[in-house]
Amino acid sequence: MAAKDVKFAGDARDRMLRGVDILANAVKVTLGPKGRNVLIERSFGAARITKDGVTVAKEIELEDKFENMGAQMLREVASKTNDLAGDGTTTATVLAQAIVREGAKSVAAGMNPMDLKRGIEIAVAAVIKDLVKRAKPVASSAEIAQVGTISSNGDAAIGKMIAQAMQKVGNEGVITVEENKSLTTEVDIVEGMKFDRGYLSPYFVTNAEKMAVEFDDAYVLLHEKKVSGLQSMLPLLEAVVQSGKPLVIIAEDVEGEALATLVVNRLRGGLKVAAVKAPGFGDRRKAMLEDLAILTGGQLISDDLGMKLENVTLKMLGRAKKLVIDKENTTIVGGAGKKADIETRVGQIKAQIEETTSDYDREKLQERLAKLAGGVAVIRVGGATEVEVKEKKDRVEDALNATRAAVQEGIVPGGGVALLRAKKAVGRISNDNPDVQAGINIVLKALEAPIRQIAENAGVEGSIVVGKILENKSETFGFDAQTEEYVDMLAKGIVDPAKVVRTALQDASSVAALLVTTECMVAEMPRDAAPAMPGGGGGMGGMGGMGGMGF
């Protein structure tokens, strides 16, 4: 076992604080509308430029092991905030640094670290209560756009795109962010349900230009097993032909004779038909077929229910206003399923999402939920260079996470104002224990840190900004760092999601309080470099005769 280096008390805290400061100082330059970028070296390819706090934090590794431990604890703050809220990582880092700094000073002055921690926790609970009380629900698309604009660093186009996507696919819908090959950033919205299975034969194609099958007002047959012969389906196929409507068969597979017969009938023009493999595998395939049955108002033909293909009637088939099938995807728009049934199914999937412990299962369930509940939107981020696209994509992802958080828990005035105003709630708390009271005062001072940093990044003195805002009695009065004016933050659309602010403070105080109570640090001693190998060149003289090899 390697020897360990142990540091105690002030020495340990000083080294840890140096690490905290290095990481926090690198991250906090990105805060606010006038925050700067950070350039990060990559082991291969071009360097990456970003304004995303957690991306910067994840890149920092320090040589001194004790400093590095402090930095890694602070990195945990950014990562946790990113996991829970998806944004607010820089705010969380700034808050944590402020609490650790003040806490270290108090410990050095002889205060009890455990009492300080208790005071920090009491104050944070009061701030969170105040934030929840003050949060305003997000009602309109314009408010969603405002949140997106602020989180993407004042880019109104991104805010508008996210609002447009959320309006189309609903709050439950899936919105993904991808890189675009062109210069423009655009939104692609897929309404209805889309799954990644295409037609089983190109002979089903109705639109040769797009190489796609396009049916209006079609029947949908959902079958759990393979379809290998059509004999049992003949009565159903005849009924479909008489109805004059197209038919789409979605089954585990349609093979051999059955597929050939369908293709021949399609080419002769007697039957408008297409066949598609069912999406997913195993149990997930069955669940997705059941989703499709509920969406289209049909029944899943399943052996478990004792159903046979020969007994299927038109009433048992699903219906859809429009079906588009290309080589790789199938999209069903306007399924005939009852709204109440779809809502019940959505509720079941939500319950499964809460119960599951597997990230993979959760992701797949969320995909199913989105497909049933609204649709899918893809924001394709474009730019002149790869570096620009990556930087913009970071901002779009932050903005998207922020808007989702805003929809969940509402919004509060942005630009650090909500935390600054929460000082009033903390100021009302008093404790008989002076060390606990000192912990409360640490949070009281730390609540100013984000707004000070936003002001300083804009080149304005933070103390003046804080003083001016606190002089004004309006709860929504604040500093717009973009224009360097004092405005009504809500009226100007400068807002933060309450969830992001809450999560940032909770995570920052949790890790910072632990750092304040640290009295000893243990790290592995650096090993001395191994002695160099003895020079062996002297004995190789006889190799000189190889000169005639002609290399």
UniProtKB/Swiss-Prot annotation:
Which terms in the Gene Ontology molecular function aspect does this entry carry?
ATP binding; ATP-dependent protein folding chaperone; isomerase activity; unfolded protein binding
Fill in the subunit field for this protein.
Forms a cylinder of 14 subunits composed of two heptameric rings stacked back-to-back. Interacts with the co-chaperonin GroES.
First-tier enzyme category under EC: isomerase
Binding residues for ATP, per the UniProt record?
T30, L31, G32, P33, K51, D87, G88, T89, T90, T91, G415, D496
Q: What is its EC number?
A: 5.6.1.7
Which NCBIfam families does this chain map to? GroEL, PRK00013.1, PRK12849.1, PRK12850.1, PRK12851.1
Stored Pfam families:
Cpn60_TCP1
Q: Which UniProt keywords apply?
A: ATP-binding, Chaperone, Cytoplasm, Isomerase, Nucleotide-binding
Is Secreted one of the keywords UniProt gives this record?
no
* Family per record: Belongs to the chaperonin (HSP60) family.
> What job does this protein perform?
Together with its co-chaperonin GroES, plays an essential role in assisting protein folding. The GroEL-GroES system forms a nano-cage that allows encapsulation of the non-native substrate proteins and provides a physical environment optimized to promote and accelerate protein folding.
Statement: the UniProt record of this protein carries the keyword Aminoacyl-tRNA synthetase: no
What name does UniProt use for this protein? Chaperonin GroEL 2
CDD domains the UniProt entry points to: GroEL (cd03344)
Query: Which reactions are catalysed by this chain?
Result: ATP + H2O + a folded polypeptide = ADP + phosphate + an unfolded polypeptide
Localization per Swiss-Prot or TrEMBL: Cytoplasm
For this chain's UniProt record, which GO biological process terms are given? protein refolding
The signal peptide, as residue positions, is none
Which organism is this protein's natural source?
Rhodopseudomonas palustris (strain BisB18)
GO CC terms in record: cytoplasm
